[in-house]
């Protein structure tokens, strides 16, 4: 029995590839593996903000979250996308249970204080209503796993006073993988892994070390949203998870293949 945390980017929730992923998940769950999904919703949130005439402000790949932006995230991520994702899973025989930070306090968080961020200069950055993960309701997740349900967790945390906080989905997935001591954290993105040239899918890097990551940030090869994604992913290797794999859109059977044959698909992070 393996424990797998799967992170889905918001752009995949309504993509045809999700049905392929869902069928692979059914195989994994039927094999008595424990699977949890964490999903974001950045593209949909940005689209709704544009429709509403609200500015989308990003700092070093992170979304600045004021009160209006948080309401958008609640509506899009914890609402529409979580429901739609659970529905697509159900249609493919997977029993997903939609959750967010306030659901049984499954994602326990506190508001992040200003801090210096890689790629954002030397001054501390205040990201607004953004949270840092403190922990998870592991007994609740354990009960769901035991009954072969798949927790589907929106990337919103909640503090002890009930205040919802926006949290980067990769952060939630990475820290959940560490807390569960997962056999694999799989990040499914719109690109086939970490690329030397973002315009060339064939430039996929099969394996990347932390030292190589630092060099690529310094020379600009890795930038934007990939920086926090990889930072959190490297950190999870020190917190209990056994492996991290970043993959693109998957074909039938590719999910298990990516986990069981590291480097055959996507990019595997090594210490």
Swiss-Prot record:
InterPro entries: AceGlu_kinase-like_sf, AcgluKinase_fam, ArgB, Asp/Glu/Uridylate_kinase. The keyword Nucleotide-binding applies. Its EC number is 2.7.2.8. Substrate binds at residues 41-42, 63, 166. GO terms for cellular component: cytoplasm. Its main location: cytoplasm. The record marks 7, 229 as: Transition state stabilizer. It catalyses: N-acetyl-L-glutamate + ATP = N-acetyl-L-glutamyl 5-phosphate + ADP. Pathway: Amino-acid biosynthesis; L-arginine biosynthesis; N(2)-acetyl-L-ornithine from L-glutamate: step 2/4. Keywords: Amino-acid biosynthesis, Arginine biosynthesis, ATP-binding, Cytoplasm, Kinase, Nucleotide-binding, Transferase. GO terms for biological process: arginine biosynthetic process via ornithine; L-arginine biosynthetic process. It is found in: Cytoplasm. It comes from the Bacteria. Belongs to the acetylglutamate kinase family. ArgB subfamily. HAMAP family: ArgB. Catalyzes the ATP-dependent phosphorylation of N-acetyl-L-glutamate. This is Acetylglutamate kinase. It comes from Anaeromyxobacter sp. (strain Fw109-5).
